[in-house]
A protein has these predicted regions:
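Structural core segment of the AMP-binding/adenylate-forming
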Residues: 141, 145-228, 347
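Conserved AMP-binding/adenylation subdomain of ANL enzymes
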Residues: 270-288, 298-342, 355-361
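Conserved pre-ATP/AMP-binding loop-to-beta segment of ANL
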Residues: 82-84, 207-210, 220-251, 258, ...
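Conserved adenylation A10 loop of the ANL superfamily
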Residues: 93-95, 249-262, 277
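Gly/Ser/Thr-rich phosphate-binding loop
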Residues: 313, 341-345, 354-414
Length: 414
């Protein structure tokens, strides 16, 4: 049974659903115009929806804004600079790091300056092929700051898959790392990167390599050490972007065919994701949110990086696995230690935990009093796993559905 407190909170979340839903479909322009007032605009849009050429709709087409400004600078400007933006928790390397919004702004603006020094400008494409480390988030935001279009590829992805994305994007540079870590093994990125460039018809100008502490890669002539890359860079300001300019390219998972490159526009992306943090996930700016995914997938883009940072809350960046780093209690340890309010993950994670610890012995070791909601998506959530999670956690377990193509929930029991 779900505890009464959790059930009551779920009921309160759902109470306003019908009214909100009716407003959204009966007068979509007024609905989204009101919501759009919650983000920063250099120039507020005078036209909310252009439906002259269906199905190619345009939202906020004469508005101008910037993704990075809304994710970082705005919170510093509003006096929230000392608030924790990112909690990096890496059980696989036994390390943690907390980054405030002010620190994030400094790192991102300098990295963006380094990109500018390399000749990267608005509209250029940049591939990010990195593990789950803070530098990967800095790279994403650095691109967004100057209007470059990032294409994040899951770290350690096969060389032929990376090569196809190099050719598709015509990337100017690739941002990568010396390696990624899996339980019991190190995945060297350099050989994969080198092979991908050999396979690709398009050749990037440079590769910027972040050297992990315990594994250094040998660099070649077209490769630059990450720290050298940023050493003499000066911070740069955000570039004013049209709402229909492109934020990023991301590929579908390939579950229904050949992976497809999805291009995301800027304005609607910011407006929608910020709105979802409170209205679907019930997260407030003072809360800690955790999406246990990877930045190489849409869940990582939307709900590790952009959504929580647009909302000004704290997001957990997790480099590990549900089991094996070191055990099936790592999720409970992170929720307890960082006072996570809501967790978003895939059913596979809970199936793995259930298999390793069916009676929840690890769960019993931790205080999860901060924890209020579990959200599942990405694949079918089988009834046995749902019931097991509800019985163990005694909080609402909400299965919702969306796609890479949409970037946020299509169907959610909120």
């Amino acid at each position: 049974m779900i505890c009464f407190n959790g059930f009551f909170k779920a009921f309160i979340m759902a109470a306003g659903y019908q009214e909100t839903y009716q407003r959204s479909i009966q007068n979509a322009e007024d609905f989204w115009s009101e919501i759009a007032n919650n983000i920063f605009w250099y120039k507020k849009p005078s036209k909310i929806l252009n439906s002259d050429n269906p199905p190619f709709y345009k939202w906020f087409e004469d508005g101008t804004t910037n993704t990075c400004y809304n994710a970082v600078d705005l919170h510093v400007k509003n006096g929230k600079g000392e608030k924790i933006a990112i909690i990096y928790d890496s059980p696989i390397t036994n390390s943690q790091k907390k980054i405030t919004y002010s620190q994030l702004k400094e790192q991102v603006s300098i990295f963006a300056g380094a990109l500018v020094n390399q000749g990267i400008k608005k509209g250029d494409r940049v591939i990010i092929y990195m593990p789950m480390i803070p530098e990967a988030v800095v790279a994403m935001l650095g691109c967004a700051r100057i209007g470059a279009i990032h294409s994040v590829v899951f770290g350690g992805f096969a060389a032929n898959e990376l090569a196809s994305r190099i050719d598709d994007s015509k990337t100017k540079i690739i941002l990568s790392a010396s390696c990624g870590y899996e339980p019991g093994r190190t995945i060297e990125y350099k050989p994969l990167l080198k092979k991908a460039i050999e396979l690709a018809k398009h050749k990037p100008e440079k590769c910027i390599i972040y050297q992990r502490k315990d594994f250094k890669a040998d660099l070649e002539k077209n490769e630059i050490d990450w720290n050298e890359f940023i050493k003499n860079a000066k911070p740069v300001e955000c570039v004013e972007m049209n709402a229909n300019d492109y934020a990023y390219i991301i590929y579908t998972s390939g579950t229904t065919g050949v992976p497809k490159g999805i291009v995301r526009d800027i304005g609607g992306h910011i407006v929608a994701l910020k709105w979802t943090m409170k209205n679907i996930y019930n997260i407030n700016p003072d809360d800690v949110w955790w999406s246990a995914s990877d930045i190489g997938w849409i869940v990582g883009h939307s709900y590790i990086v952009y959504g929580p940072l647009f909302h000004g809350c704290t997001t957990v960046l997790f480099e590990g696995k549900p089991v094996g780093t070191p055990d099936a209690g790592v999720f409970w340890r992170i929720i307890s230690e960082h006072k996570v309010k809501s967790l978003f993950t895939a059913p596979t994670a809970f199936r793995a935990i259930k298999k390793e610890d069916p009676n929840g012995e690890f769960f019993k070791k931790y205080n999860l009093s901060s924890f209020e909601f579990l959200f599942l998506a990405g694949e079918r959530a089988d009834p046995d796993t749902l019931k097991w999670a509800e019985s163990l956690l005694k909080v609402p377990v909400i299965d919702h559905w969306w796609q890479t193509e949409t970037s946020w929930a299509i169907s959610a029991n909120c």
